[in-house]
Amino acid sequence: ARGDVAARLTAAGIDTRAAVIYRQTLLDLTEEARALLSDRRPVIVPLYSPRTAARLAEVATPRAPLHLVAMSNAVTRAAAALHAENRVIADSPDAPAMIRAVLATVRRVEGM
């Protein structure tokens, strides 16, 4: 698991056991997503995890101008291979901050 918390706690002298509580299955891009990324119109892409950002960078070959909105610096680093018009990092790693960042990006893109 990311961060290997159980191993770090055990190394600090706290007896722990690891358990996977949530596992996200990576999916391929839908045809609709591929079509949007192939267009020349701007696409705002909210990215919530480094894993998803890396996967998008791996499978996408966008022609569209991308405007990436990332939940954290780690997410932005994972998307480094994607060419983007701009990259925004949310003020904090939570849903309200992501919503604010996406809305600010929408306003900026629409003003272009």
Question: Where are each of the predicted segments found?
Answer:
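Conserved beta-alpha
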Residues: 1-112
